[in-house]
């Protein structure tokens, strides 16, 4: 079943601010919370749907990705712009209702998947069309060797949090609500570090640069993403790592522009070739090909070279190369050349406009326009 629009789910317009998004979610969460609707599967689904919508629309980066790409931009707890790790229902609900039940919904309360990361990969058009393999260097959080990931100074150990007894969560009861909240003392870690490691400052991780090999499939275009599973941030409390999303950005080409599977280029020709016709070589990504120019060709005419475009990344027939002719006006003429052109112009005028029909038609239209004007 297709997902509903997140703005529709919360009953808000697309231009509302974060406060209105939060207000709409509070209203729906109070109405459909499972503790208020025991055994009602429909209410539970409505609650989950509202929570999912709030998770995206309350985050500026996720919301921007959703506005641009729809559900595809935020599926898998990742968006085209933010790529934050996914939050659990209890985290989100605690964030919204923490002021009611005491304590905010800060850190993660259980084993959570690590955050996704994004890397922008600049490619030449030829690389994007043919495919390539590139090496990239990205920052990575790795386990601190000094403390073996405990976050505590060597020779010491973290203590079990006495507030939550190591669970990382405390249960709050208010009326018909019974909600697990992140422990305010240990922030969900379940442990307290009395003597933080000086290398990682108590986090258990240090940042290093790592080199990854990225296989770029043929046919990718700007905006396409390549997913490297498990290469994101490390998980929290034993959770799995996130993913690294490599986003493609194709550099501007000096000859070709791309539109989907088709390529476009401009081909300058002399006015003699335009008038008399001829044959010239034009570039393609596979080499040079002959292009026949018929006589009386005008600027702007498109010539299609079938199959000389791009094969889509998901397969299918290759596109075409469309060459747009631009008739070039000669410059730096000699006196003799100018005299010949004046002689040619005189002969053109004697033809009564038959050899320049567009020009003749335009001037006739202008003359008629002024004749019809009343002064």
Curated annotation (Swiss-Prot):
Keyword Cytoplasm: yes
Zinc finger intervals, CR-type: 131-209
CXXCXGXG motif repeat start-end pairs: 144-151, 161-168, 183-190, 197-204
Source superkingdom: Bacteria
SUPFAM superfamilies: Chaperone J-domain, DnaJ/Hsp40 cysteine-rich domain, HSP40/DnaJ peptide-binding domain
One Gene Ontology CC term in the entry: cytoplasm
CDD domains registered for this protein in UniProt: DnaJ (cd06257), DnaJ_C (cd10747), DnaJ_zf (cd10719)
Protein keywords: Chaperone, Cytoplasm, DNA replication, Metal-binding, Repeat, Stress response, Zinc, Zinc-finger
PANTHER family documented for this protein: CHAPERONE PROTEIN DNAJ, DNAJ HOMOLOG 1, MITOCHONDRIAL-RELATED
Family: Belongs to the DnaJ family.
Protein name in UniProt: Chaperone protein DnaJ
Gene source species: Hahella chejuensis (strain KCTC 2396)
């Amino acid at each position: 079943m297709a997902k509903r629009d997140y703005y529709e789910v919360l009953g808000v317009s697309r231009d509302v601010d974060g406060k209105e998004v939060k207000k709409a979610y509070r209203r729906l969460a109070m109405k459909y919370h499972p503790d208020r609707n025991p055994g009602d599967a429909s209410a539970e689904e409505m609650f989950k749907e509202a929570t999912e919508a709030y998770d995206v629309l309350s985050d500026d980066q996720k919301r921007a990705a959703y506005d641009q790409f729809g559900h595809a931009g935020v599926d898998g707890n990742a968006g085209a712009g933010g790529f934050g790790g996914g939050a659990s229902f209890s985290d989100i609900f605690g964030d919204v209702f923490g002021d009611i039940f005491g304590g905010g919904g800060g850190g993660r309360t259980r084993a959570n998947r690590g955050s996704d990361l994004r890397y922008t990969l600049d490619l030449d058009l030829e690389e994007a069309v043919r495919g390539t393999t590139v090496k990239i260097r990205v920052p990575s959080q790795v386990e601190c060797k000094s403390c073996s990931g405990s976050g505590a100074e060597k020779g010491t150990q973290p203590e079990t949090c006495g507030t939550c007894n190591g669970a990382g969560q405390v249960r709050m009861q208010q009326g018909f609500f019974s909600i697990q909240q992140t422990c305010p003392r240990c922030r969900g870690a379940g442990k307290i570090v009395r003597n933080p490691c000086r290398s990682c400052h108590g986090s258990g991780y240090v940042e290093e640069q790592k080199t990854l090999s990225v296989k770029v499939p043929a046919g990718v275009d700007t905006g396409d993403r390549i997913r490297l599973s498990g290469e994101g941030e490390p998980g929290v409390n034993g959770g799995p790592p996130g993913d690294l999303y490599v986003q493609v950005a194709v550099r501007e080409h000096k000859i070709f522009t791309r539109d989907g599977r088709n390529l476009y280029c401009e081909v300058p020709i002399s006015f003699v070739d335009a008038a008399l016709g001829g044959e010239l070589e034009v570039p393609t990504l596979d080499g040079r090909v002959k292009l026949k120019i018929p006589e009386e060709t005008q600027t702007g005419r498109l010539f299609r070279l079938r199959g000389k475009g791009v094969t889509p990344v998901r397969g299918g027939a290759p596109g075409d190369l469309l060459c747009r002719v631009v008739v070039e006006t000669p410059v730096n003429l000699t006196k003799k050349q100018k005299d010949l052109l004046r002689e040619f112009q005189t002969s053109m005028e004697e033809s009564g406009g038959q050899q320049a029909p567009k020009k003749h038609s335009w001037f006739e239209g202008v003359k008629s326009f002024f004749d019809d004007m009343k002064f």
